[in-house]
């Protein structure tokens, strides 16, 4: 073993001297570079083919992972923006609740906290993106336009850019409005809690006009809000839907089923009760909420 190791070290040493004297590595490198230049187009085609195969394999794996999926259908009419899907679900949720969607006009979504509004918006946008990219939709049926997809969800303030939360919201909305002007291709947008970074009166006023303007400009908008006033102000241009909650004593559960019409329930204080906050806090909160509701009406 020692002799063979010594012979190996000697051969490696001689090879190193050989490379240093005759520049063998450089000669080989430039030889390969010459081949690459000659076969440049073939190599680019090979790389593109390899990438396409990897994408197709990934798509097949994704489809195998899904409990069910459908190949999407798209409208031929350029002015058709309708979004239709049956038994649609979010692919990243285990044992998801499926919902139907059939919208040719905008949707305003209300409902209590944790009832499923944000997840529904993500489901709508994500499945449209999957349909337009890998021809795969998590539903039993899907037919829609080919959209430019935008969202204003899960926003955060930016310390690096010096933007407050409200400024980030404004920029996000402006991005959607600018997109509408940039092309004739229909825009699909999802908006979660419009302008929640400001006071109630201005939020309701600005949200009403912003959402109304999106509808007038032909955008297919799915928006979620806790401001029940919007369901009245926008009833002529937005279809009202909501998610319900089921209350049993101190326990609250959610069926996650889309229901026609605006929400009439409130559960924020009930959730405080369910998580064990002092009764004095929740009772006083109930009384104050009822007083404020009475003043608004």
Please give the residue ranges for each predicted region.
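Alpha-helical bundle segments enriched in helix-capping/polar residues
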Residues: 1-105, 297
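ATPase nucleotide-binding head domains, primarily ABC-like/P-loop NTPase cores
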Residues: 59, 66-297
């Amino acid at each position: 073993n020692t002799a063979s190791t010594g012979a190996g070290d000697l051969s490696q040493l001689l090879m190193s001297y050989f490379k240093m004297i005759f520049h063998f590595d450089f000669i080989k490198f430039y030889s390969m570079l010459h081949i690459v230049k000659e076969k440049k187009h073939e190599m680019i085609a090979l790389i593109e083919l390899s990438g396409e195969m990897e994408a197709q394999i990934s798509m097949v794996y994704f489809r195998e992972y899904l409990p069910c999926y459908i190949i999407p259908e798209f409208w031929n009419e350029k002015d058709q923006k309708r979004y239709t899907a049956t038994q649609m679900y979010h692919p990243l949720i285990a044992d998801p609740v499926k919902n139907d969607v059939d919208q040719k006009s905008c949707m305003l979504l209300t409902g209590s906290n944790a009832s499923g509004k944000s997840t529904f918006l993500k489901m709508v946008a994500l499945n449209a993106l999957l349909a337009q990219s890998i021809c795969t939709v998590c539903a039993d049926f899907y037919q829609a336009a080919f959209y430019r997809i935008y969202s204003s969800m899960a926003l955060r303030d930016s310390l690096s850019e010096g933007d407050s939360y409200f400024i980030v919201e404004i920029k996000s909305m402006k991005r959607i409005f600018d997109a509408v002007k940039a092309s004739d291709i229909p825009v699909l947008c999802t908006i979660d809690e419009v302008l929640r970074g400001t006071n109630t009166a201005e939020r309701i006023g600005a949200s009403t006009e912003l959402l109304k303007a999106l509808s007038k400009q032909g955008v297919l908008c799915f928006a979620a809000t806790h401001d029940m006033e919007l369901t009245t102000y926008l009833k002529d241009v937005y279809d009202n839907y909501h998610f319900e909650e089921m209350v049993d004593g101190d326990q609250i559960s959610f069926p996650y089923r889309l229901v026609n019409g605006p929400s009439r329930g409130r559960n924020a204080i009930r959730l405080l009760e369910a998580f064990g906050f002092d009764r004095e806090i929740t009772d006083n909160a109930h009384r104050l909420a009822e007083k404020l509701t009475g003043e608004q009406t």
